[in-house]
Amino acid sequence: MLKNLFRKTKYITVSQKNIGNYKRENTPTIPDGMWVKCNKCGEILYQNDLEKNYMVCNLCGNHFRIGVKERIKYLFDKDTFKEWDYKIKTENPLDFKGYDEKIEHIKEKTNLSEAVTTGKGKIAGMEVVVCIMDSKFMMGSMGSVVGEKITRAIERAIELRLPVIIFTASGGARMQEGILSLMQMAKVSSALAKLDEEGLLYICVLTDPTTGGVTASFAMLGDIILAEPDALIGFAGKRVIEQTINEKLPEDFQKSEFLLEHGFIDKIVPRSDLRKVLAKLINMHQNSF
């Protein structure tokens, strides 16, 4: 009896080769990109439903970061957007090591020419000039080409007597271009001052994230400043500020809701309502003259 109790267990060994040859004929395959996990609530979302809902989680309302193509799709009347200045090429004025290669790699990966796309389109039949920043391109950092494209768009808006809408999404000035990137803050701000002198409307829509030199310049110069829900908006990072002033900062003090509460922005607009709100603001401005 004891001999049977402590006898060695026998196992069947299956080689890895045999496992690899085993085919699960009835196992369904799920194509890549069909399901997306919400990074806020953890819900697994069907990609097609998410796109129909403006890339917003239907459970918690989390606004996913979106790029230029999605913005154009959700904002403009169909087939009315015309891109400007897409041939302007990014240079390496400081001969920063690896910068040229990095730019080319990101261009191939994102199919974008730079961190901002500018152009003209129609919202509810009304023409507007728009600049859309995309955080997928070097975190939407502002270099000389970004500043040049936005400035040209504003100058063209003055010529055409059209309102300007800028969607911000940026980590700030591009370090690889040094002082030239910081110059773009003043350059764009100067162009916006001329737009203001002409009595033309400038609406800024702050999206997640809007930080650094972009926040310190044109992001906060709008006649009307809108923001998407729960967007990160600030200049320096929270930890940097806390270490500098040696004080604990309020929770979510760099979120759009906090900024609205303290009078830094005019309104928080869910993405699904943005086109309607912008159309109303543009129409009101046009009818005031």
UniProtKB/Swiss-Prot annotation:
Necessary cofactors: Zn(2+)
Disulfide bridge positions per record: none
Binding site for Zn(2+): 38, 41, 57, 60
Pathway assignment: Lipid metabolism; malonyl-CoA biosynthesis; malonyl-CoA from acetyl-CoA: step 1/1
Domain CoA carboxyltransferase N-terminal: start-end pairs: 34-289
Protein location: Cytoplasm
A Pfam family matched in the record: Carboxyl_trans
An individual GO BP term: fatty acid biosynthetic process
UniProt xrefs under PROSITE patterns: COA_CT_NTER
Reaction(s) catalysed by this chain's protein: N(6)-carboxybiotinyl-L-lysyl-[protein] + acetyl-CoA = N(6)-biotinyl-L-lysyl-[protein] + malonyl-CoA
Keywords: ATP-binding, Cytoplasm, Fatty acid biosynthesis, Fatty acid metabolism, Lipid biosynthesis, Lipid metabolism, Metal-binding, Nucleotide-binding, Transferase, Zinc, Zinc-finger
Record carries keyword Nucleotide-binding: yes
Cofactor mode of binding and number, as noted: Binds 1 zinc ion per subunit.
Nucleus is among the record's keywords: no
Quaternary structure annotation from Swiss-Prot or TrEMBL: Acetyl-CoA carboxylase is a heterohexamer composed of biotin carboxyl carrier protein (AccB), biotin carboxylase (AccC) and two subunits each of ACCase subunit alpha (AccA) and ACCase subunit beta (AccD).
Family membership noted in the UniProt record: Belongs to the AccD/PCCB family.
Protein name, entry field: Acetyl-coenzyme A carboxylase carboxyl transferase subunit beta
Source organism of this protein record: Clostridium botulinum (strain Kyoto / Type A2)
